[in-house]
Amino acid sequence: MARPNEADRGTDRALADLERRINSVYSQAAKELQEEIDAFFKHFADQDKKMQDLIGQKRNGKEWTEKDYQQWRLNQMGRGARLEALRDKLAERATEAKEVALAYVNDATPEIYSLNRNYTAYTIESVHPSADFTLFDEQTVKRLIVEQPDVMPYYPERLALKRGIDLAFGKQQITASVTGSILQGRSIKQISDDLQSRIVTMSRVSAIRAARTAVTAAQNAGRMDSYAAADEMWGIKSKKKWVATKDLRTRHDHGMADNQIVDYDQPFDVGGYKMMFPGDGSLGAPGHELYNCRCTVVNATDDDLEAERHMMRVKNPETGEYELVKKKSYKEWYDEKKAQY
């Protein structure tokens, strides 16, 4: 089994930081939303208690029943201008939180991409001394996205908020939450708690899922683009291997693809769908094969490349001759590369 390397560990740290930032955004949103929800239901609290206490009593010559009380609640809390105003405000705030979260994701992916592209370049140079990659950094990636996107053919698209769809879905969920809670006879506190949980948790889970999916795509795209560059510039043909996370959360199709090896420019067969790498939807793989994926693609010989201190051939910058030396660590290789600029 491929062991986690420095690129894997760096990617995991970046994802953990990203999730912390997203959770912080939603914690603040939850606090603000709770204030709006509390204000809305406080308006009804006293009257709601009075109407509930009337059950079994005569009102306007007719016995006031549980059904009458439920209908009153629907008319007062489940419909009308007040609910619409609350619905619109909550949906807008949740959408704003998701917009910030996606901006965080888009800001993080260049660093994740460059880390994995550079690390893969290091593994290739370790066994192919003729290769001489140029280092990528976050700013280089951001510039190339605009100026030379063809240099990074596998770089994932930016995540974009579908504002209209998100708003409409949020409003629908809010209305359904209030109406459903009333029909189930929940107390005002229970209605309030369910509404807060549904709107915030639903949006936060969606944002975290988008972050994990985007990080996986950027991680593996960086590796793929190094394979492609090695072939284009030095004729080095790499084979790639699908590596699935070994636990019970891994979906069946991805577990079955584990250790599948193909040429770097050929797709994997994952559950009958073609994918160039984990997180790749360019060949038509559906969302259920992409979302929350934790798989990675590695060079098919990465198990050998990652072993401690193999010998490697490098060019002596003073003599121009190739020499056999102990394999450099990634940090040593990176520092030497950086010193060349």
Which residues are covered by each model-predicted region?
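Charged, compositionally biased non-catalytic regions
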Residues: 194-198, 202-210
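N-terminal leader/targeting and assembly helices and adjacent pre-domain segments
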Residues: 1-199, 300-341
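Acidic, glycine-rich two-metal-ion catalytic cores of nucleic acid-processing enzymes
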Residues: 205-310
